[in-house]
Amino acid sequence: MTASLNVLLPAPLTGRGPSYTCGMLARSMHGPELSVTVFVPRTRGFSIAPAQVHEALPFWLKRVPYRLINAYGDRKTESDFLDEMRLRRNGSACAYVWPDTSLATVRALRDAGVTVFREMINCHRGTAKIILDEAYKRTGLPPLHSIDDRSVENEQRVLQAVDQVFCPNACVESSLLEHGVERHKLLPASYGWDPARFKGDSKLLPPDDGLTVVFAGTICTRKGAHLLLDYWARSKVRGRLVFAGAIEPCIREKWGSLLARDDVQVMDYVSDVGGLYRSADVFAFPTLEEGGPQVTYEAAGCGLPAITTPMGAGRITRHDREGFVLDPYDDKGWISALQMMAEDRSKRQAMADAAREHADAFQWTDVAKRRRQQILDHMSGATPERNRTPLEALV
């Protein structure tokens, strides 16, 4: 009998952010052994076939800005999800819930005897709050993030209620253990990349005779953009530092002089990320707090060595192999790494080759296959140790 996995994503399925990650996992987990259905408020231009999709909202609400109906959309999606799970109380169906699923829904699933898996797209909120509070304090700013004590407590209760938790980063695992989540609940996992999304040979940027370093993602304090600006300026490397993403207002206000340098370029949202990466020599990502840093996997797939942090390394970047993994506040280490990438082309190329080779094991099809096996093993009563081996062999 084919097992069923019902996925609850309390957000529109748009192919961006967490919905992209969820969709790519669902698409490749679906198969003869495991039937996957994703419950969402609505979809927009993103197919995850052969996985199934259940849209909770009626068609006439599809074009209403989601911020105006998000409370209703989330409630309706969770209600439909619970109705479906109550119909499948034969042990062949599991629930896989994503962040922002309500505690009430998780408890209702447990009361119905349903096994619940939970995704972590970031570290435990308690850990994230500590990291971000300190980051803003260092910059002389008040905390400009949205994590409060109430949300930390709510997430802790959800984590206590679920059966298993997918951890896409070793730092995520550590953060959960620090907050008392039982080790046996933790399932080491990763995110991945899609080679089809990066095929081609076009370049987004014109050639440059110096080193091209790229940063992709929200240009914000959490992702260490201000640190990279400082390290780049102090490295005195000849070349260009290119940021691609939306910018946090305080970064523009407080580090405007560094952003205005002739060797710094800021781009808004980039649709051709492959073209951006093909224009670059190095991927730099001094992120302070992260779950599964998808951009790191994608950069590696495009053959870019990384200079990043333990948070930004994910399961793919190993220190002195696919790049450098450094403490985000290690200014001397970061400056030295940037200088080495500029001066030692042979070592940089060796790291680039290693990154491209290692990325082959993190294509979405392989990532999802490992996840599917973890779910099936749990449903069959396999030991937790067996759930760990496929991924640990890669890192």
Region locations from a protein language model:
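Nucleotide-activated donor-binding/catalytic signature segment of Leloir-type glycosyltransferases, i.e.
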Residues: 252-270
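Conserved donor-binding/catalytic core segment of Leloir-type glycosyltransferases
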Residues: 200-223, 229-234, 242
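Acceptor-binding helix/loop patch of EC 2.4 sugar-transfer enzymes
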Residues: 61-70, 116-153
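Aromatic "clamp/platform" in nucleotide-sugar-dependent glycosyltransferases that forms part
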Residues: 288
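Carbohydrate-associated surface elements
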Residues: 171, 192
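Short hydrophobic beta-strand element within catalytic cores of glycosyltransferases
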Residues: 305-308
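Short alpha-helical donor nucleotide-sugar binding micro-motif in glycosyltransferases
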Residues: 159, 269-270, 276-280
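Conserved acidic donor-binding segment of nucleotide-sugar-dependent glycosyltransferases
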Residues: 319-320, 324-331, 340-345
